């Protein structure tokens, strides 16, 4: 099995509100840094911050992109995000239907 030639990724970002998630996704779509975004939530998040355990509701955004666009995508998210340290993670897409992956590639710069 050969890896995908274009190294597509799913990028995960959490935000404190649906509006912020939509604003970030809209900008990334306009810049063609992502092909699409799925906003899920609210979800419960538990984490350590400033020496304390925190619990909050967030919105989880899953975005489809290419690995070579991650640095630009990440910088754009940081510029628009309200968190001091936003969660921006990329996971490789190891397989996918040809039609979907062709569409995904056609949507990106």
Where are these regions (language model features)?
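Positively charged, small/polar-rich N-terminal and surface patches that mediate targeting and assembly
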Residues: 1-109
């Amino acid at each position: 099995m050969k890896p995908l030639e274009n190294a597509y990724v799913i990028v995960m970002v959490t935000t404190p509100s649906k509006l912020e998630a939509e604003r970030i996704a809209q900008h990334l779509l306009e810049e063609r840094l992502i092909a699409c975004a799925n906003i899920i939530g609210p979800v419960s998040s538990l984490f350590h911050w400033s020496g304390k355990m925190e619990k909050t509701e967030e919105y989880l955004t899953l975005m489809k992109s290419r690995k070579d666009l991650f640095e630009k995508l990440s910088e754009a998210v940081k510029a628009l995000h309200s968190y001091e340290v936003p969660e921006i993670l990329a996971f490789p897409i190891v397989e996918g239907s040809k039609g979907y992956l062709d569409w995904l590639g056609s949507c990106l710069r």
